[in-house]
Design a protein with these regions (language model features):
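Acidic, mature catalytic/reactive cores of soluble proteins
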Residues: 1-55, 72-74, 81-907
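Active-site-proximal polar cores
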Residues: 68
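Basic, low-complexity intrinsically disordered segments
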Residues: 64
Length: 907
């Protein structure tokens, strides 16, 4: 067991709080719903980047390479100034939704290079131009571009020409859970000496301005010579920031500069932007001469030669200066400082070596490690008391005279105040429940406890609606997202069991009870006609459909969604898996297995049995489509070949016979149910038909349908890209689908890159690109089919190639293609970086990896949010899975038997 594993164990057993401090600062608090108190709900305009340096936040904080405690009481981050910018670089810059041609977009280069799960060691890289940062150029040029044009990026502005920039590395190393060493290494990559002001900044989140019962905390300088900032908070206690070298300490308050923001006199001359005004604007009286406040920075003025590196060292600790006196040989920056940093770095190497498959080469190991590091850096303290927020904006739902709230007034029960895995801490600095389910798959690779805690969090009464709905995201908690929580729950349970030798049954039981509420909400709310056909609404695939699926249809009527119904079939299967696992040790759950067996039969048959002309399955095309049901009773398939039609393939789960052997009445009652309804058995895969080792398969598709869908999916002219499965078939490049509603045209074409519409904000595209989470679900399903059919079912992969594979091999081939987006090819290039030569060839860029939101459907280049390691980080789990699974042993033992075998090896 490595040192990091021991720390995880100590934290789990609550002996030492190794996770108390971490990268829990957001990278963008401005422009969020939480900070929006506007009449119309325009969060981007209400609180802008320009205001952020001067205006105190209500619900959280942000910063560069930020670090805080898990309640975000005390925050640390980096500020930089190159002597030319109009403002301090205190936070990342990006464009708002209306400023960019493809929606909101960060315009900086920064990388999450490393992190252990306890954050005992972390490493971050920020690339800072030596020329003035081109704020206005980025805004104006992007604003002038159309949706069919490329985005104007920071490299395009030429500020990195001749390598005139600084590489600023920030490392955190914990000597103890409360003693944190901070090392900032500044490299001048340019040809000439350049100056840089480095301002490590410590501040308290402003709670006192909003809550009258909160005692105001204090930062103050200790001693006349400086070098130490004392932080005192009634809840957190005392902390000390030790600053190496001769750096003056600058103090102000984390209070709004109301004069600048609102044109009203500020309560204090010392405000949030005072340090900026002191340094950039030369206002020497802007900072507090008494050396106290609630925000402070040490000012290091560096002159860095070409190719030179200079280091700034700090230490945030609960250890008082009196305990660091020379009498006991201690010093905040003595020999022990570097020893701790090197030791934690070495322990991080040992930790990742212990989980990295032996078959991985250095590049594969680097991809996996940086994917996980990005997941760990993307943790954020998320604070949002919706009831208080509504009250503060005059929208209290319990008062008759109230302002209308632009959103979330039905979620007034919610109180969020937790560290949560974010999709992207700049572009999506708020949790998204269905994204989170995929995050957990990667996070459990290194920290099963955190993964379990994240899944359970969404089911707690402070999050889940009393009616059973799981919250979507802050822009509209009531939106409908795919029900993947149960899948992530059973998957996590099995992964932990395989890793630790036993699964957490109590966690599984409590999760199951809450998931029952969510399942009931779905059945009651989303099945309009009580025919087990689900409309769904938004369902997370944004612009994939012919219409905006969360809005009323231009034709009237309603849409029966193939993916909505497939999601519910998968939800049934996952709940059946959980109930079956629990029934092995608790007979109370045996009855629940039958409940979900019957639910699955009804839902699965509804997809294929609604009628030859009006059902979702099209026999001629061998594919599933959404069905438009018009007010006059007519129905029409919307023949778009998209991920919508592949999702029914994903609703497949194999079961062994353990529960049936223990409770034979389940088989008897299920058989009676089917015997009385032969039309159901005829419409789906025969659930009574045995597969390998007498296993059973719950699947919407029988073998004939499966083969036809796979033939389309694995056709390189359709869905199979060199880098995974596309979200829309390439067939639509030359054959767009067109639908007319009156004189209004609706068109779906194959768009392999960015969206050409503003639907759902325009900052994502499901009409062609490759999306990692959907590929992960397809891979999961193929493994399920393999465990049932074994080597008896082989298909051409790619279609028409003559190369036949079983379905495990197909899953491995898709995973290989996905992995190849990030790995160097034979020419040393990473497809994810496309034609960006700096990323392809420069030794200071080429091994720094970004895990984008989605990827070009033809060439694999990264698109969308650049740091959505969130669900794209699942590539780490997929790479690991195919490097460690023995398919022959798994086929022989079965899914649960294989998990039990691995568990026996661990115990």
């Amino acid at each position: 067991m490595t040192a990091e594993h021991l720390r995880l164990e100590a934290d789990r057993e609550r002996r030492l709080p190794w996770k108390k401090w971490g990268p829990y600062l957001s990278e963008r608090q401005w422009g969020t719903v939480r900070e929006d108190y506007s009449e119309g709900g325009d969060a981007w305009q209400y609180f802008s980047h320009d205001q952020a340096r001067s205006r105190a936040y209500r619900w959280g904080e942000d910063g560069l390479a930020g670090f805080s405690d898990d309640q975000q009481q005390l925050c640390f981050a980096l500020a930089l100034w190159n002597g030319k910018d109009p403002i301090l670089k205190e936070r990342l810059f990006g464009l708002t939704n209306s400023e960019a041609n493809h929606g909101e977009d960060v315009k900086e280069y920064y990388f999450y290079l490393d992190s252990t799960p306890t954050h005992s060691y972390m490493k971050y890289l920020y690339k800072y131009p030596q020329a003035a940062f081109p704020y206005s150029d980025l805004v104006e040029t992007n604003r002038g571009r159309g949706r069919n044009e490329f985005e104007y990026e920071l490299l395009d502005t030429h500020v990195f020409d001749e390598d005139r920039y600084f590489d600023v590395f920030v490392e955190y190393a914990k000597a103890t859970p409360e003693d944190i060493l901070i090392k900032i290494s500044v490299h001048n990559r340019g040809p000439e000496t350049a100056e840089l002001h480095v301002l490590p900044t410590l501040w308290f989140r402003n709670r006192w301005s909003w809550q009258g019962d909160v005692e105001r905390p204090l930062l103050n300088q200790i001693g006349a010579s400086g070098g130490v900032i004392k932080a005192v908070d009634s809840g957190l206690g005392e902390r000390y920031l030790y600053c190496d070298g001769d750096a003056p300490l600058l103090f102000t308050e984390n209070e709004t500069n109301t004069e600048r923001i609102f044109g009203a006199p500020s309560r204090s001359p010392y405000v949030k932007d005072s340090i900026n005004n002191y340094l950039v604007n030369g206002q020497r009286d802007a900072v507090n001469p008494d050396k106290k406040g609630t925000k402070a920075a040490a000012h290091y003025h560096l002159s860095v030669g070409p190719g030179e590196c200079q280091v700034v060292r700090l230490r945030l600790s609960e250890v008082a200066p009196t305990a660091l006196t020379p009498t006991n040989g201690a010093s905040p920056f003595g020999k022990g400082f570097e020893e701790v940093v090197l030791a934690r770095q070495k322990e991080a190497d040992e930790f990742y070596a212990s989980i990295t498959p032996d078959t991985f080469d250095a590049d594969q190991a680097n991809v996996m490690r940086q994917a996980v590091a990005g997941m760990l850096w993307s943790k954020q303290f998320y604070h949002y008391d919706v009831d208080k927020w509504l009250e503060e904006r005059g929208s209290d739902p319990f008062k008759a005279s109230r302002r209308a709230a632009p959103r979330n007034d039905r979620w007034h029960h919610m109180y969020n105040g937790d560290v949560i895995s974010m999709p992207d801490k700049w572009e999506y600095p708020w949790y998204a429940a269905w994204d989170l389910a995929f995050h957990v798959l990667a996070l459990t690779l290194v920290d099963p406890d955190f993964g379990k805690q994240q899944l359970k969090l969404m089911l707690r009464e402070r999050y889940m609606h009393p009616n059973g709905q799981i919250p979507a995201y802050e822009w509209n908690f009531g939106d409908v997202n795919p029900p993947v929580h149960a899948w992530a729950t059973i998957f996590t349970y099995r992964l932990e069991k395989a890793e630790r030798g036993e699964g957490d049954k109590e966690w599984l039981k409590s999760s199951f009870q809450k998931l029952l509420l969510n399942f009931t909400w779905w059945v009651n709310r989303k099945d309009r006609s009580d025919r087990n056909v689900f409309e769904g609404g938004f369902l997370g695939l944004d612009n994939i459909g012919v219409f905006d699926r969360s809005a009323p249809l231009p034709t009237g009527g309603y849409l029966e969604q193939a993916d909505g119904t497939a999601w519910m079939a998968l939800f049934c299967e996952n709940m059946l898996e959980i109930a079956s696992e629990l029934a092995l040790s608790d007979p109370e759950y045996a009855e629940m297995t039958l409940k979900f067996i019957e639910h699955f039969y009804w839902i699965a048959s509804a997809m294929t049995h609604a009628g030859q002309d009006t059902g979702m399955w099209d026999e001629e095309d061998g594919f599933f489509y959404d069905v438009l049901r018009l007010p006059d009773g007519k129905a029409q398939r919307l023949k778009v070949r998209s991920m919508v039609g592949l999702l029914p393939l994903c609703a497949a789960t194999v079961f062994d016979g353990k529960v049936i052997e223990m409770y034979p009445e389940i088989r008897e009652r299920a058989s009676r149910f089917l015997s009385a309804r032969p039309e159901i058995r005829a419409a789906i895969h025969d659930p009574g038909k045995p597969g390998v080792a007498n296993r059973r398969l719950a699947s919407i598709m029988n073998e004939a349908k499966l083969r036809r869908v796979l033939a389309t999916m694995l056709d390189e002219k359709e869905f199979l890209s060199p880098f995974g499965i596309r979200s829309v078939s390439r067939y639509h490049a030359d054959h767009p689908y067109v639908f007319w509603a009156g004189d209004q045209e609706f068109r779906v074409s194959y768009l392999p890159a960015e969206s050409d519409t503003g639907m759902f904000g325009g900052n994502s595209n499901w009409r062609g690109p490759i999306w990692m989470p959907m590929n992960a679900l397809i891979v999961r399903a193929l493994i399920q089919y393999y465990l049932y059919y074994g080597d008896d079912l082989t298909v051409e992969c790619p279609t028409g190639s003559g190369r036949r594979m079983n379905l495990y091999q197909v899953a491995g081939e898709i995973t290989r293609r996905l992995s190849n987006m990030f790995l160097r090819d034979k020419d040393g290039r990473r497809p994810v970086y496309g034609g960006t030569e700096k990323f392809q060839n420069d030794p200071h860029w080429r091994d720094c990896l970004l895990f984008y939101e989605y990827f070009h459907g033809d060439n694999g280049a990264g698109l969308g949010a650049s740091h959505q390691t969130g669900w794209t980080g699942v590539i780490a789990r997929m790479m690991h899975l195919f490097a460690t699974i023995d398919p022959e042993k798994m086929l022989e033992a079965g899914k649960m038997g294989y998990v039990d075998m691995l568990a026996a090896e661990k115990s």
